[in-house]
Amino acid sequence: MAGNFSEIESQGNISLKFGFLGLGMGGCAIAAECANKETQIKNNKYPYRAILVNTNSQDFNKIEIKNAGNVRKIQLEGYEQGAARNPQVGEEAFVKHETKIFETVKQEFEDRDFIWITCGLGGGTGTGALLKAIEMLYEHDYNFGLLLTLPRDAEALKVLENATSRIRSIAMNQEAFGSIVLIDNAKLYRKFEEENPSALANEYTSYSNKYIADALHEINLVTSSFTPFSDTHFDASEFAQVINTPGVLSLAKLELKSNQLDTENPLGYLTQLGNALEKGVLYDTEREELESAKKSALSIVTSPLRASRLYNFSFLNQMENFLKDRTPYVDERPIAPYVNKHTAKKEEDIVKFYSVVAGLPLPKRVSDIIDEITRIKEEREQANSKKSNAVLNKLFAFDDSVQEEKPKKKKLNFGAEPEAEVADDSQPTKKKLSF
């Protein structure tokens, strides 16, 4: 989704007013990037608000903020050096300043339709504060969901363990709040590497934050910016119902040229659409997971020229059957064909598909992280045991007993004129120690 906006699309209307509560370094960076999203809507250039909560004072200096009026920073005083990847410290810091944080939430998010708690799982501040932030919003009846990044396998063992520990706690209580959007850092990192092979390593963070912000912003535009072609559409109120659905939320997007959409031979483009649905924008979803979804929707956007030719009964029927096949047990699954009357000339031939699927189980990626933790621990134990045994074997083989040396026998001297013995009253030389 990132990088696919046209200037005209940025003039569209947003469906829902989002607030972002950023926790820790990663969460604050994502929240700030979401608040940086611009539109050309009159009196609403920056439609989103963010509150950034962190311990380490230096982290705030790394965050670019385009409109200070839409972003509030809360420094957790007394913890300026950070939480050192210790979630207990992050939780303690949040609890100590919870009153101040909640007062800011009331002030900044009073008119928000939905709040996203953003957090990079695995660290200290964000991971530690996450459960307390959930409790705070839940107890005060806010509509909210979670926007969480999953660590890559290359992260340290402690990071992986911190992340899985929090996911387990969240899973036990996920029916109490709205959707969970998971961002697989491993997936985004591979995408960045493929698209930017010569880029510097430190450019990835900026790329991923913008990618996440664009994905959420674009789907929020689609549901409110274009002209419905038929009586069936997916509006802002339905989008609100979807993101308020407990469980994991998957976003997907596919762009095809109109000549790739042969309604008489639909297998080709339906296969591509199915792959896009499973791959997702932010994390991969398996087909079996999609089948357990609670809600789904598919929006289609194209130019007026293509809409008049494409949106026939046969095509829309194929779309309905496709979504029914992929998400058979959902409560609702609207198919919404839209017309973008402001399509740029170069995009007149493009057809864009957007899907949202809610109420999903935790993805296989979480299981993969647990497997990675198990592998690291087993290999570490084997390595330590092997090294320890090698040292012990040497120690046990080492003979540290000292045998008493016999005095050397005096050489005989039968010379013609033997020298007279001279008494030596000096003390014997002390033997040096050798360890």
From Swiss-Prot:
MF term (GO), any: GTP binding
UniProt keyword annotations, A-Z: Cytoplasm, DNA-binding, GTP-binding, Hydrolase, Nucleotide-binding, Plasmid, Plasmid partition
EC id: 3.6.5.-
The name this protein goes by in its record: Tubulin-like protein TubZ
SUPFAM superfamilies referenced in this protein's UniProt entry, alphabetically: Tubulin nucleotide-binding domain-like
Organism from which the protein derives: Bacillus anthracis
Subunit (UniProt): Polymerizes to form two-stranded filaments and bundles at higher concentration in the presence of GTP. Binds to the TubR-tubC protein DNA complex.
This protein's encoding gene: tubZ
GO BP, one annotated term: cell division
